[in-house]
Amino acid sequence: LKEAQCAIVVIGDETEQDVWIEDCSVAMANMHLMASSLGIGSCWVQGRLRNADEKTTEEFVRERLGFPENYKLEAILTLGMPDAEAPAHQLDELPMEKIKWERY
C-alpha cells in the first residue's frame, strides 16, 4: 500500500443497508476486474476486522480520511502499473481434488 500509485478506500454506511459488506465487496470486485481489463495492476487490501498496531485498520484509516462513524471500512484497492505479469496456472496444476460435485 505504501508504494501504490493510487488507492481507493471502499466504505459502506451500515445504517443504510444490512448488506453493506456485500455491496462493498461487489464494488471492489468490479473495480479489480476493470483495472485488469485496462492493464492496470490492482491488489485487494482487506480492511474490515483487521488491526494496525494498537488500533483497528478502520480506526487508522478513519483518522486519516475523516469519514463518519456510521461508515465502515470494507477494503482498499491499490492500483498501479505492474512491473511484470505472472503466467496463468495451467489446468493440470490446479488441485482438482478440492472440487466437489453435488455433494461434499
Locate each region found by the language model.
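Acidic, surface-exposed loops and disordered segments
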Residues: L1-Y104
